[in-house]
Structure formats: C-alpha cells, structure tokens
C-alpha cells in the first residue's frame, strides 16, 4: 500500500523549510523589539475553549473544527486558531497577577487545524504567527499591533499593503446595532441563505461575514455599525484613527468587516494584499482586533486583550508570487573526500574537527569514487575540500583546496586535528 499525506496537509521539505525558518526568524526579531515573548500551548484543547471563545454560531465551530471524544470521554478539539489557547494559558497560569508587567505580551508560531476545502494558500493543517497583549485598554496598543504587523511585512520586502479597520464598539453599541440589523434583515428573511437565516436568530452580525452571493446585496446595504457606536466607543475609534494618521499609515474604514470569530469588540483590522497566487481581488493575510471580554469568558478576571494572526502558507505563497528574494543559507564550509575504505577513520576525525571549530562540514559515507565526491562538494557549495587517501595517511598530511581561488596546499594532518579553525583561517580567510 502506498501511503499519502492526508488531504489538506503538506510536507515542508528541506528546500522549502529554509524559507519558513527565515520568515519565522524575522517575525521573532520584530516581536522582540516590541517586548513580546514566545508562548507555546497544546495543539489540542477542551472543545469548550473554542466554542465559548469563537462563538457556537461561528463557521469555525459549526463547520470547521476537528473534534472528537478521547478515551476518557473528554470532548477534545484540535486548535483552529491560536488566541483561545493563549487566553486559557493566561488564565490558568495567573499571568494577570501583580508580579507580571502589563501589558503582558506574547507571540506564538505553530500549526492550526480546520476542516475546509483545500485551495491555494488554505489548508486543513495550516500554520499561524500570532501575537496577544493582555491587560492594557489603551487604544495605542491596538495601533501598536497593527504597526508591528506592517513592520514585519515590510521587513520581508512587501509593499502596497491595504489596511482595513472597523470598530465593533462596546456592549451597548453592539446591542443597539444588533437590533437595527435584525430590523433591517427580517423583511428579507426568505431571500437569505440557509446559514444566514440561522445566524439571524443567534448572532445577526455573522450575516455580515457571509460569502454567499444571495446575502451580498443585503450586506452591502446594511446599516453601518459606526452609526450605533456609543459616544465613548466612537471616541475610542477616533483615537485609533488619529494615531494611524499620525504614523502615516494608509488605511480604509470598512464598516461591514466583523471578522470570523465572536470574541472581538472595539477595534478590528485586516491587512490585505492583491496577488495572483491568492485568487482575485484583495486577500487577507493578517487579521485581528481587541477582545475585552474573552479572558473573563474563559474564567479569568476582566482583563482586556488585543492581537492578530498571520497565515504562514498564504504569506509564503505571496512572497514567491511577488518575486521577493529571500536570503539563502551559505553552503558547506568543508567537504572531506576520502579515497578508499582505509581512510574512513581519518575522514571521520577530520569532519569532526571541522565541526568542533564551528564550521559546516560533511563527508562521503558511501565509499564513492573521488570524482563523485568532488561533484557533491561542488553541488553543496563547499568552500574547501579536504582530500585524504592512502598516501596522505602514510605521509601524515591532508590535501587542502580552496574552491573559490583554486589554491591547493598540503597541510599536516596533526595540525588539522589539533586546531582546524586556525588552519581554515590561515588558508581561507587570510588567503
């Protein structure tokens, strides 16, 4: 039987993993400058963590989650997004305590799981980079996470990004808007999609998130939530826009944007880009916002939070589509060519000495002919080849060749084994 990877998953092979490592490394560097530290949470959590946080009417919970009963009859779900697990960890470990600085800033990088139709940039197992900041209600933190995302994308070489912002207001704002939306949609009930009919009863804001063509005309003409913000919520949103303006960030206000998860309130945002690899029109590559009630919903104190998530698959597709050239790792420093089985021990000692000196080194393990070994050394971009055969062993020497200059020299084997770094520096770095 020939086994294949599950549908909607991918093998990230060594030729591609280098790109992933670079992108993740840039994220870590950027986040560090903003005071964020890494957090790692389980790949699976209690089902209730996600149903309570994402909302039991959201597509994530009703259609996309991988959930099951384990052998202890516990209802478990593979994480479909990162925020809920981080909030659970924040509450369980009492990271809101007075001994911790506020805002408490963390980031995560890892796989998520959603059962949806696989397509370009969208898999059933996908990877996400995300940040969360807890304990500060200041709208400046909202703007900070937006600017941090933009700084990350620009560091990778992306430009012409579109930022969309909206406010979902406070609890009173949403209650007022909820009723206005129900009053607007009720007369069109029979014309809505089946999903939107159900959403209208349970969470009418979800209708605005519908991608069904039957709902689009009603979404476009729906009342704006911005007209229902309380004075305090409107003032807060004005502060966010003022700070974005002061930083020269190009943005648009999208009053129909609600995001796909129920825990957001006040500021929400998306960073979008237009690229062939991700379909027609603008595609979201980063989304997030504020969630002032989520910590309390999961059993903690009334602590505000704000964050975002970035899809790694989509981002890496985009980088390739835009022709962004990412740095590549250097090849080998040293390749040891051993001629004949009798050189096995000395080849091993030489490659070990090179690695002990902090160099990237490799050798032949297949007892191939010298020509094949030199071909491998060239393919791997080796800066130096060391050749050791029966004659070199008898003479106590090693044939040392600098590939870039063609310089060749015979070096005492004992010197290489005693201090390979010194020999390498003498013949390569000093010419």
UniProtKB/Swiss-Prot annotation:
Cited Gene3D superfamilies: Anticodon-binding domain (3.40.50.800), Bira Bifunctional Protein, Domain 2 (3.30.930.10)
Keywords, ordered alphabetically: Aminoacyl-tRNA synthetase, ATP-binding, Cytoplasm, Ligase, Nucleotide-binding, Protein biosynthesis
Catalysed reaction, written as an equation: tRNA(His) + L-histidine + ATP = L-histidyl-tRNA(His) + AMP + diphosphate + H(+)
Subcellular location: Cytoplasm
Domain of life (superkingdom): Bacteria
Main location: cytoplasm
Similarity-based family: Belongs to the class-II aminoacyl-tRNA synthetase family.
The name this protein goes by in its record: Histidine--tRNA ligase
Lineage: Bacteria, Bacillati, Bacillota, Bacilli, Lactobacillales
């Amino acid at each position: 039987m020939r086994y294949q990877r599950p549908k909607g998953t991918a093998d990230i092979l060594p030729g591609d993993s280098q790109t992933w490592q670079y992108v993740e490394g840039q994220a870590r560097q950027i986040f560090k400058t903003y005071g964020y530290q890494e957090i790692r949470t389980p790949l699976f959590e209690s089902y209730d963590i996600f149903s309570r946080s994402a909302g039991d009417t959201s597509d994530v919970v009703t259609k996309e989650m991988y959930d099951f009963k384990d052998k202890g009859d516990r209802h478990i779900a593979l994480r479909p997004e990162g925020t809920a697990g981080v909030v659970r960890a924040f509450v369980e470990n009492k990271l809101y305590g007075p001994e911790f600085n506020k805002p408490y800033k963390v980031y995560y990088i890892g796989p998520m799981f959603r059962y949806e139709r696989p397509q370009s940039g969208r898999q059933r197992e996908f990877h996400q980079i995300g940040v969360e900041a807890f304990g500060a209600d200041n709208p400046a933190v909202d703007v900070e996470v937006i600017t941090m995302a933009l700084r990350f994308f620009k560091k990778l070489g992306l430009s012409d990004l579109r930022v969309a912002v909206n406010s979902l207001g406070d609890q009173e704002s949403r209650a007022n808007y909820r009723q206005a939306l129900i009053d607007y949609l009720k007369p069109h009930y029979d014309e809505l999609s089946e999903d939107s009919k159900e959403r209208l009863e349970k969470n009418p804001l979800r209708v605005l998130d519908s991608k069904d063509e039957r709902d689009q005309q009603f979404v476009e003409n729906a009342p704006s939530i911005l007209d229902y913000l309380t004075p305090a919520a409107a003032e807060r949103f004005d502060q966010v826009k003022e700070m974005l303006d002061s930083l020269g960030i190009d943005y648009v206000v999208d009053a129909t944007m609600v995001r796909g998860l129920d825990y957001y309130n006040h500021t929400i945002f998306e960073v979008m880009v237009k690229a062939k690899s991700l379909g027609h029109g603008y595609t979201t590559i980063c989304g997030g916002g504020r969630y002032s009630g989520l910590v309390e919903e999961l059993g903690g104190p009334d602590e505000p939070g704000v964050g975002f998530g970035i899809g790694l698959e989509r981002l890496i597709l985009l980088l390739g589509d835009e022709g962004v050239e990412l740095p590549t790792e250097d090849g080998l420093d040293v390749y040891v060519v051993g001629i004949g089985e009798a050189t096995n021990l000395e080849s091993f000692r030489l490659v070990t000495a090179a690695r002990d000196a902090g160099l990237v080194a490799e050798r032949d393990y297949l007892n191939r002919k010298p020509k094949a070994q030199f071909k491998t050394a060239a393919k791997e971009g080796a800066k130096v080849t060391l050749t050791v055969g029966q004659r070199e062993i008898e003479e106590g020497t090693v044939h040392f060749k600098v590939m870039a200059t063609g310089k060749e020299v015979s070096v005492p084997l004992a010197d290489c084994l005693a201090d390979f770094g010194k020999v390498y520096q003498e013949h390569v770095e000093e010419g």
